[in-house]
């Protein structure tokens, strides 16, 4: 990666290290994200979204290895892993048993965690440079439509909001969500 392309990530990585919530393009809409290991940042994201912690959150990553500190990989058999890996990187979010030490702010009232390996190049670069996954939820204030452009993010959240500019992918719908243990579809994509 050139130093020029690395430079666009520097203020966003700094914001993440400073426990701030950021906005970035994903496959379908702009996402709001933060450091999953920062209770302060996760609480700020939940407050911004007016989202109850009990619902749980999604982690988005550059690769599966970034997710393993948060999920119980030993709960999966080879077939479940193969099915999951066949869909990644891509627009399928899998609900996987969480490690017991994974924050309840991430899992909510569940013993599982929703995770996805993104195929959006900016998300992959962002997670690689940050060195871990991000909490990911749609960029919109309660009652408003998810943002599909940087301009819409700035209209809803203000011009000073930490924003990784770029284009969303071509998907019209949010990611499909499936349970890895049962294969059950939780949300249609």
Curated annotation (Swiss-Prot):
Subcellular localization(s) per the UniProt record: Cytoplasm
GO cellular component, one term: cytoplasm
Catalytic reaction equation(s): L-threonine + hydrogencarbonate + ATP = L-threonylcarbamoyladenylate + diphosphate + H2O
PANTHER family: SUA5, THREONYLCARBAMOYL-AMP SYNTHASE
Gene3D superfamilies reported in the protein's UniProt record: DHBP synthase (3.90.870.10)
GO biological process, alphabetically ordered: regulation of translational fidelity; tRNA threonylcarbamoyladenosine modification
YrdC-like domain ranges (all copies): 6-189
Similarity section: Belongs to the SUA5 family. TsaC subfamily.
Keyword Transmembrane attributed: no
UniProt keyword list: ATP-binding, Cytoplasm, Nucleotide-binding, Nucleotidyltransferase, Transferase, tRNA processing
An annotated Gene Ontology molecular function: L-threonylcarbamoyladenylate synthase
Primary subcellular site in the record, as a coarse category: cytoplasm
InterPro entries tied to this protein: DHBP_synth_RibB-like_a/b_dom, Sua5-like_dom, TC-AMP_synthase, TC-AMP_synthase_SUA5
Statement: the UniProt record of this protein carries the keyword DNA-binding: no
Name used for this protein in its record: Threonylcarbamoyl-AMP synthase
UniProt xrefs under Pfam families: Sua5_yciO_yrdC
Lineage of the organism: Bacteria, Pseudomonadati, Pseudomonadota, Gammaproteobacteria, Enterobacterales
Function: Required for the formation of a threonylcarbamoyl group on adenosine at position 37 (t(6)A37) in tRNAs that read codons beginning with adenine. Catalyzes the conversion of L-threonine, HCO(3)(-)/CO(2) and ATP to give threonylcarbamoyl-AMP (TC-AMP) as the acyladenylate intermediate, with the release of diphosphate.
Enzyme Commission number, as recorded: 2.7.7.87
């Amino acid at each position: 990666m050139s130093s020029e392309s690395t430079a666009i990530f520097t203020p966003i990585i700094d914001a993440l290290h400073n426990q701030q919530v950021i906005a970035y393009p994903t496959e379908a809409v702009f996402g709001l994200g933060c450091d999953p290991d920062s209770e302060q940042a996760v609480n700020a994201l939940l407050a911004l979204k007016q989202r109850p912690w009990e619902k749980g959150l999604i982690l988005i990553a550059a690769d599966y290895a970034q997710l393993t500190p948060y999920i119980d990989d030993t709960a999966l058999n080879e077939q479940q892993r193969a099915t999951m890996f066949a869909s990644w990187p891509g627009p399928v979010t899998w609900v996987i048993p969480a490690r017991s030490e994974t924050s309840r702010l991430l899992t909510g009232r569940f013993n599982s965690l929703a995770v996805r390996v993104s195929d959006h190049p900016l998300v992959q670069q962002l997670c690689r440079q940050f060195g871990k996954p991000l909490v990911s939820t749609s960029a919109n204030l309660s009652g408003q439509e998810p943002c599909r452009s940087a301009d819409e993010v700035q209209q809803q959240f203000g011009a000073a909001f930490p924003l990784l500019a770029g284009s969303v992918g071509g998907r019209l719908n949010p990611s499909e969500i499936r349970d890895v243990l049962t294969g059950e579809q939780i949300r249609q994509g």
